[in-house]
Regions:
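Short, contiguous strand/loop micro-motifs
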Residues: 1, 59-60, 86, 160, ...
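Short active-site oxyanion
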Residues: 1-5, 81
Length: 274
C-alpha cells in the first residue's frame, strides 16, 4: 500500500529521520507572553529555555485545531491509498480528539493515539513507516500500531524541579527539599499518564548512569532494534554518561540522539518491549 505517515510535532524526531521516512508534522502551538508560535517552526526550545532562565513565565501549548488537521489531511489524502496520523497521547492533549474529528471527512485517513509523548510517540511513528509497505490494509496497520503503544517505554530524569514549580506540578517547598537533598526524580509514562517511579540522589551525571542501568540491564524482554536518547541543553559530561551506560547495557542496533522539542524539557531514554 501507498501509505502516508503524518504526526504531531511532539514526536521529537530529527530532521534527518523526518526526511528519511517522508514524515510530515502537524505543529502544536506554543504560547509565550501571549504570542502564538508554531512548534519547531517559528520558535525553538532554546528560545523557550532562555526566556524562562531570564525570569519569564513558563510557556504553554495548545493542541492542533480541527481546521489545521483538515488542511494537513487534504494535502495528502487524494494522492495515497491511505494516511495514518499519530498523535501525542490523548491524556496529554486534545490533539487526538481534534484529529479524529478532522479525519471523519476523509475515508482513507486513520488516527492513532500514541498514548505517549516525545520520542515515545516517535517510536510509534517510525513503526508506522516500517510496517506501511507490508500492510495488507489500513485498518490492519492501525491495529498493529495500537497494540504497540502499550509496549513503548518512555521515562526521563529531572535535574531540577524549577519547571515543575512554574508549571504548578510541584510545590516550592517540595522543590527546595529535593534540590537541597540533591534528589533527581525519574518520571515514566504509564498508561498514557506521567508518574514518579523512583528518585535518585547525587550528581546528575552519576544519577543518569544509574538510571540507564536500571532501565536497560537484565531486561531480556526488550526489543534491541532502536533506542532514543532525548535531551535538552546539557553539560557534555551528562550526555557522555548516558552514552556510555547505553553502550554498556543497551546493545541496540540503532541509537538515535534527539533534542527534545518545545513540549518536553527533560532527559529521556525510550525503547520498546517485545
Amino acid at each position: 500500500m501507498n501509505v502516508k505517515v503524518t504526526a504531531d510535532s511532539t514526536c521529537d524526531l530529527s530532521p534527518a529521520l523526518l526526511a528519511r521516512y517522508d514524515i510530515t508534522l502537524a505543529p502544536l502551538t506554543v504560547i509565550k507572553d501571549g504570542t502564538s508560535y508554531a512548534d519547531g517552526l517559528t520558535i525553538t526550545p532554546q528560545e523557550i529555555f532562555s526566556h524562562v532562565a531570564a525570569g519569564g513565565s513558563l510557556c504553554s501549548t495548545a493542541a492542533v485545531s480541527v481546521g489545521e488537521y483538515q488542511a494537513l489531511f487534504s494535502r495528502f489524502a487524494g494522492s495515497c491509498d491511505g494516511l495514518v496520523h499519530i498523535t501525542i497521547g490523548s491524556g496529554f492533549s486534545a490533539c487526538y480528539q481534534n484529529a479524529c474529528l478532522a479525519a471523519a471527512g476523509f475515508p482513507n485517513v486513520r488516527v492513532v493515539d500514541s498514548r505517549n509523548l516525545s520520542t515515545g510517540q516517535g517510536h510509534v511513528v517510525l513503526e508506522a513507516c516500517r510496517l506501511r509497505d507490508q500492510a495488507a490494509s489500513l485498518d490492519g496497520l492501525c491495529q498493529e500500531l495500537e497494540q504497540l503503544t502499550g509496549k513503548v517505554e518512555a521515562s526521563f530524569l529531572l535535574n531540577r524541579l524549577d519547571y515543575m514549580v512554574k508549571g504548578g506540578r510541584c510545590s516550592t517547598v517540595a522543590a527546595l527539599g529535593a534540590n537541597l537533598l540533591n534528589l533527581k526524580p525519574c518520571i515514566e509514562v504509564r498508561d498514557g499518564k506521567m508518574q514518579v517511579v523512583k528518585k535518585y540522589r547525587g550528581p546528575y551525571a552519576k544519577c543518569l548512569a544509574n538510571y540507564v542501568k536500571d532501565r536497560l540491564d537484565g531486561r531480556p524482554e526488550l526489543r534491541r532494534d532502536r533506542l532514543f536518547i532525548t535531551y535538552t541543553p546539557v553539560e557534555p559530561d551528562c550526555l557522555a554518561a548516558v552514552r556510555e551506560a547505553v553502550d554498556r547495557y543497551g546493545h541496540f542496533r540503532e541509537v538515535f540522539e534527539t533534542s527534545a522539542g518545545c513540549t518536553v524539557s527533560c532527559h529521556c531514554v525510550l525503547f520498546i518491549r517485545q
